[in-house]
Amino acid sequence: IARCYFCGEQTSQTLFKLQAWENCCCDSCSSRLAINGPLWLGPLQSNNVLIEMKRLSENLSSSVTSQSRKLINRLQADPGLPVFSWSTHELASRFSLKSPPPLDLFIKLLRSEGFQAFRNGVVPGHFRTNASIRELLRVCEQKLPEGFK
């Protein structure tokens, strides 16, 4: 995964092209990309393993497993795709919003616009989407209630 720190756009490419990253593809900056990886970009979790972990945790003390069960539930709800992950705090900072939009509200807005959007089960406060940075900006400008703009 590569990210343009100037405009925020994210992109990915296969390991076979690792040395051949181009500059940012957006119209406004053509900046060099900050590259992370190589990274695994598929789902991290097996639902069968998570189901078994949840079953095993039922025999343990809730004081030990409360946070673990919450994590298992988050991982089960996270399909692991799309690969690009965003923070509502980053959106608020990048787009000069008064405050970060609630995660569930923003996911609902993205879905209403036809995008895939899910909570990131690995990183709390982040969401996964196939929307580009320009599309995220448009949703922020056109769909967020006035209290956030």
State what each model feature region is.
Residues 1-149:
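SAM-dependent transferase fold signal centered on methyltransferase-like domains
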